[in-house]
Structures are given as structure tokens and as C-alpha cells.
Amino acid sequence: IENERILEEDKQYFWFPLDGEKKLFTENLTPGKQVYKEKLLTKKGIEYRNWEPFRSKLAACIMNGLENFPFLAESNILYLGVSTGTTISHISDIVGPNGTIFGVEHSSRVARDFLDRVAVFRKNIIPIIQNAKKPDQYFSVFTKVDVVYVDIAQPDQTKIAIDNCKMF
């Protein structure tokens, strides 16, 4: 494994050696800040955050060869089910300061952690404390989005995803 970053073309994530293995990283939008005690790595003056596949389904997909990665710099994203903010924080790194993520979370207890640990430090995240089943009540979404990312576990999650896609 080389010691330099390897940029996956148009994907905005990086592979670096760490602890003798090839690990996944994103460039930290908020240098010096961790979200879930992930390892930070600085290369050539740029800070990167280790994206743990055991804490993020999206990271696990990338580690297993995900071919269609829709998140790009400056994208507008609707993220359903942000939970405590692990995955959305890495997507925030990827879309950068000119992208926007509308992060929907229904559970007020989980949302409190997300707000305190992630959203307050990341200006490109707009938190929405609302039920993903009611997209007509997201008053903070002010534009059409490029991607709807669904990270919820509901029996009717397909209907929820389709309803959100139709609205935004």
C-alpha cells in the first residue's frame, strides 16, 4: 500500500494505509473535530477521517466494491434516518461546503445526539426532526435534491422512499 492518497475518480473518498491495512477516509470538512471517535490522519496538511465500515452501511458498501456512488461535491441530498450522524457526517465531507444535506430523523433522543455532535458543527447539514413518512411536513427542504438516501428500518420503507423521491 502506498503512503499517498488514492482518489477514486469522481467519488471523493480516499484509501490510506492504517494499522497495516487499506482503510477508507473522507477529507474532514471540520478539521480537528471527530464525530464517533474515528481516527484522524493528516497528509500534506489535509486532515482525513477514517470511515468505519462497521459503523456505516454506506462505507461497508464501498469496501465491498459499490459501483454506483451518487454523492458528489456540491450535491443536494435528502438523507432519511440520520440516527446519531455517523454516515451523514462523511457524506457532509464529500458534498463539501457548497453542497446541502437535509437530514431527517424522527427519534428525538437520537436526533439530540445528531444535533449536538454533528449538525451544530457542519453548516452544510440542515436537520429536520420529522417522521420520514410525512415528507409534506419538511418545511426546511427548499430545493429539489440530487439524491435521496434511505437509512431507515421500517416495514414500509420502499413506500417511504418513493413518497420522498416524488416530493423532492
How should each PLM-predicted stretch be described?
Residues S83-P97:
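Conserved SAM-binding loop of SAM-dependent methyltransferases across substrates and taxa
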Residues P31, V35-E38, E52-N76:
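Conserved alpha-helix/loop element of class I SAM-dependent methyltransferases that forms part
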Residues I62, G81, V148:
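Residue-level signature of catalytic and energy-coupling elements of molecular machines
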Residues I1-Y48:
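N-terminal auxiliary segments of SAM/dcSAM-dependent transferases
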Residues F102-V145, Y149, A153-Q157:
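S-adenosyl-L-methionine
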Residues F71-G85, I101-F102:
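Conserved class I S-adenosyl-L-methionine
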